[in-house]
């Protein structure tokens, strides 16, 4: 996307995309996650046609030069997800809305037989920060996932990954409440994905900007790993891979990294 909150993740030319992919793979990234619609707070609306155009441009490059790379697409639109899987071989659907913004998403994922990353968010990227009033944030998100996991399983979808949605319809304090209770999400018996890379929960608390937030990101990634996180969604692959390796070495278990 041209308007991602982190400038270094905005890759729009063929050369820039190829250079970024080469860097990700050389640093140990395992999955490439592509988005054509910025999900930052107050992001501009993007039409389905424009979103698909942006994704297709990058996917064609990946299919041509990196045919063996595992691809994920970040979209809340069922038809965009379908086209990415059927036309470009995308392996994973990453939906920030958990099916809330497109009623056809769950059935589409069921037909496509691909893993589904389900995130918690209220509202839309444009309105989500107006919806941070929770009586009990952990209870609400646990109930949200319980309801949606049940719906997906009734449709035959069992390959589900949970993402609590750091920074999406949550205040800074609420984000840290989630971080402190991450292990509770393991009660579902499903993989847990965490994406905190350079987000405002870091630089609004510590001061600075997204560009200043790598150290904070690494600390939170480490806390997440120690509390049951299976997949990290990151910008800075090398730092994340090193965190994974050190935690894995210390506690002798296997973890994954997930790049954006």
Please give the residue ranges for each predicted region.
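Active-site-adjacent loop and "lid" segments of alpha/beta metabolic enzymes
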Residues: 4-20, 39-63, 70, 76-78, ...
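Catalytic domains of carbohydrate-active enzymes, especially glycoside hydrolases
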Residues: 19-35, 227
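Phosphate/pyrophosphate-binding loops at sites that engage ATP/ADP/AMP, CoA/4′-phosphopantetheine
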Residues: 25-26, 30, 146-160
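Hydrophobic "anchor" residues on beta-strands that sit immediately upstream
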Residues: 29, 70, 90-91, 159-161
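Short, basic/glycine-rich phosphate-binding loops at helix/coil junctions
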Residues: 35-39, 161
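Conserved strand-turn element in the central/C-terminal portion of the radical SAM core barrel
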Residues: 159-169
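Arg/Gly-rich low-complexity intrinsically disordered repeat tracts
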Residues: 252-260
